[in-house]
Curated annotation (Swiss-Prot):
Organism annotation: Pantoea ananas (Erwinia uredovora)
Location in the cell: Cell outer membrane
Renumbered residue ranges of the record's region Disordered: 271-303, 327-358, 372-399, 423-448
Entry annotated with the keyword Repeat: yes
Protein name: Ice nucleation protein InaA
Location of the region described as Octapeptide periodicity in the Swiss-Prot/TrEMBL record: 162-1281
Family: Belongs to the bacterial ice nucleation protein family.
Phylogenetic lineage: Bacteria, Pseudomonadati, Pseudomonadota, Gammaproteobacteria, Enterobacterales
InterPro entries, sorted: Ice_nucleatn (IPR000258)
Amino acid sequence: MKEDKVLILRTCANNMADHGGIIWPLSGIVECKYWKPVKGFENGLTGLIWGKGSDSPLSLHADARRVVAEVAADECIAIETHGWIKFPRAEVLHVGTQNSAMQFILHHRADYVACTEMQAGPGGPDVTSEAKAGNRSLPVTDDIDATIESGSTQPTQTIEIATYGSTLSGTHQSQLIAGYGSTETAGDSSTLIAGYGSTGTAGSDSTLVAGYGSTQTAGEESSQMAGYGSTQTGMKGSDLTAGYGSTGTAGADSSLIAGYGSTQTAGEDNSLTAGYGSTQTAGEDSSLTAGYGSTQTAQKGSDLTAGYGSTGTAGADSSLIAGYGSTQTAGEESTQTAGYGSTQTAQKGSDLTAGYGSTGTAGDDSSLIAGYGSTQTAGEDSSLTAGYGSTQTAQKGSDLTAGYGSTGTSGADSSLIAGYGSTQTAGEESTQTAGYGSTQTAQKGSDLTAGYGSTGTAGDDSSLIAGYGSTQTAQKGSDLTAGYGSTSTAGYESSLIAGYGSTQTAGYGSTLTAGYGSTQTAQNESDLITGYGSTSTAGANSSLIAGYGSTQTASYNSVLTAGYGSTQTAREGSDLTAGYGSTGTAGSDSSIIAGYGSTSTAGADSSLIAGYGSTQTAGYNSILTAGYGSTQTAEEGSDLTAGYGSTSTAGADSSLIAGYGSTQTAGYNSILTAGYGSTQTAQEGSDLTAGYGSTSTAGADSSLIAGYGSTQTASYHSSLTAGYGSTQTAQEQSVLTTGYGSTSTAGADSSLIAGYGSTQTAGYNSILTAGYGSTQTAQERSDLTTGYGSTSTAGADSSLIAGYGSTQTAGYHSILTAGYGSTQTAQERSDLTTGYGSTSTAGADSSLIAGYGSTQTAGYNSILTAGYGSTQTAQENSDLTTGYGSTSTAGYDSSLIAGYGSTQTAGYHSILTAGYGSTQTARTRSDLTTGYGSTSTAGPDSSLIAGYGSTQTAGYNSILTAGYGSTQTGQENSDLTTGYGSTSTAGYESSLIAGYGSTQTASFKSTLMAGYGSSQTAREQSSLTAGYGSTSMAGYDSSLIAGYGSTQTAGYQSTLTAGYGSTQTAEHSSTLTAGYGSTATAGADSSLIAGYGSSLTSGIRSFLTAGYGSTLISGLRSVLTAGYGSSLISGRRSSLTAGYGSNQIASHRSSLIAGPESTQITGNRSMLIAGKGSSQTAGYRSTLISGADSVQMAGERGKLIAGADSTQTAGDRSKLLAGNNSYLTAGDRSKLTAGNDCILMAGDRSKLTAGINSILTAGCRSKLIGSNGSTLTAGENSVLIFRCWDGKRYTNVVAKTGKGGIEADMPYQMDEDNNIVNKPEE
């Protein structure tokens, strides 16, 4: 019982220094040379009495040492902080962890009379003691006696080597070597080597090697090797290797290799390899390899390989390979390969391969291959192949292949092939092939093939083939083939073939074949064949064959055959056959056969046979037979037979038979038959039919039909029909119909219809219809319709429709529609529509629509729409739309839309939209949109959008968006967005976004974003984002983000983020983040983070973080963190942390942390921590901590800690701690501790401790402690202690040089009788 002593608790640094710089011993007396008995922490030693009170003065560092010391009660002074006392001297009894220190105080407090009151003062405190019963263990002392001391009884054949504060428990034939403060428990035939503060528990036949602060638990026949602070738990036959701070849990016969900070959990027979910070969980018979920060979870028999930051979850017998940042979830027997940032989810037996950033979800036994950024969802037994950015969704047994940006959705057992940007939706057992930008929707069992930009919709068992830009809609069992720009709609089991620009609508069981620009509408089970530009409408069970430009309308069960430009209208059950340009109208159950250019009109149950160019009009139950060019008009119940060119006019129930060229005039119920060239005259209500060259004159309300070259004159309310080359004259409210080459003159409110080459002149409010090559002249508010090559002239408010090659001239408020190759001229506010190759000229406020190759010129506020290859010229405020290859020129505030290869020129405030390969030129504040390969030039404040390969030049405040391979040039304040391979040049304060391989150049305060392989150049204060392989150059205060392999150069205070293999160069105060293999060079005050294999060079006060194999070079006061195999070089006062195999060089006062196999070189007063197999070189007063197989070199007052097979070299007053098979060398006044089979050499006044079979050599006044088989050599006045095992316990044999025949500098050993003898010379 000690009545005058108390126990205190305090903390010291890892090197046992307190806050005042006093070095506390590991055991024994410590005294303050500057003691002053006054309150305060200065000038004395301090501690917590009995460990109770405020913990604020205690150190919270992870490597802080807890010290328990004995203090005289009469020397203690209470200070202000609760529980803390001050004293001049103390005796250290215990050094360890927080738990071990508190346990020591708890177990030994009963040996002391507690001090309950303390009074401060120079005379010492007044102590009132309270006695407590108990036994006391002797404290560890530093006393040295030349006597034999007995140890505690040990189990048979157990070897324990422990430093201060450690606890060892071993069974039969176990070997335990522990650093200070460690706790080890081992079964039979086990070997444990632990650093300070570690805890090891092992079953029989196990091997454990642990760094400081680690915790190890192992079953039988296990092998564990752990870095500092790690936790390992393994069952029988496991092999665990862990980096510092890692956690490993393994079942029987498993193998785990973990990086620092990683977590591993494995069942039986597993193999796990984890990077630092990763998490692995595996069932039995699995193999997992993980990058740093990744998470892996696998069931039985799985094989997972993951990049850093990835997440992998797998069922039994699966194989997963994941890029960094990817997420994988797989059922049993699945195979997944994922790019970085991708997400994969698969059920049993699936095979997934995904690019970076893609998402894959698959059912059982599916195969998915995805480009980067794509999304795939598949049912079982499916096969999906996707381009980048595409989306695929498939049910069971489907096969999908998609281009980039496409969307595919399919039912079970479907096959889809999609171009880029296309959308596909298919039911089960469907086949789809889509061009880029197309949309396909199909039900079960359909087959769709679509060109780019087309739309396909199909029911069950349908087949669709679509050209680009076409739209197809089909029900079950349909077959559709469409040209570009066409629209097809079909019922089930229909067959449609469409030319470009055609429109088809069909009921079930129909067959439609359409030329380009044609329109077909059919009910169920119809058969339609149409030429280009034709229009067909058919009821059920009808058959229609139409030439180009023809119009067909038929009810059910009808048969229509039409030549080009003909018009056919039939009721149910009719049979019509028409030549080109003919017109056929039939009632139900009628039969019409018409020659080209003929017009046939029949009531129900009629039969009409017409020659070419003939005109037939019949009531119901009539029979008409006409030669070519003849005109027949009959009311109901009439029977007319006419020769070619004849004209027949008959009243109701009349019968007319005319020879060719004859003229017929008949009243009501008349029958007229005319030969060729005849003249017919009839009063009111009469019906006349005339032959060739005939002349017809009729009263009011008459109806005249004339043959070729005939002349007709009719009064009020007359109806005239003339053959080819005929001349017609009619007063007000007349209706005129003329044949080829005819001349028609009509008064106000007249209606004229003219044949080919006819000439028509009409008064006010006239309606004119002319055949091919006709000439029409009309006053105000006339309506003109002309055939091919016709010429039309109309007054104000006229409406003109012209055939192919026609010429039209119209006054104010006119509406003109022209056929192919026509020429149109209109005054203000006219509306013009032209066919192919037409020329249109219109005044202000006109609207023009032109066919292919047309030329349009319009005045103020005009709207122009032109076909392919057209040329458009418009004044201010015009709206122009042009077809392929067109040229557009517009004035102020114009809007232009151009087709492929068009050229556009627009004035101020214009909006231009151009097709492929177009050229656009616009003034200020214009809006331009261009197709592929187009060239755009715009003034300031313009907005440009360009297609592939386009070139854009814009003025001030412009916005440019360009397609692939485009070139963009913009002035200040421009916003540029470019496609692949584009080149962008922008003025001041511009924003640029560029596609793949683009080149960007921007002025001050620009924002640049570039795709793959792009090159970026920007002035000060720019923000650059670049894709793969890009090169970025930026001015002052720039922010750069670059993709893979990019090169970045930035001005002052820049922020750079680069992808894999990039090169970065930045000035002062920059922040750099680089991907794998990158090279970063930054100015002072920079922050650099680099990926694997990178090389970093930075100025003063920089912060560098690098991936595996990187090289870091930095200025003073830098903080460097590097991955595996990296090389670090830094200035003074730097902190370096490196991964495995790294090489570190640092200046004075640096702190270095490295993984195994690293090399460290530092200045004075540095702290180095290295992993297994490391090489460490440090300056004066350094602290070195390393794993096994390390080489450590330090200056004076250094502290070295290493595992087995290490080499340690240090200066004077150093402390060295190493495992088995190590080589330790130190200067004077050093302390060396090592395991078995070691070599220890030190200078004068040193202390050496080693295990069995070691060699210890020291200078004068040293203390040497060795176990069995060791050799001790010391200088003068030294102590030699041999620890001997006699089969029951350890005994210490102590000797001093210079006494008892022990000479200095001579090697000594113990013989079999525990006698100290000279080592024989070898």
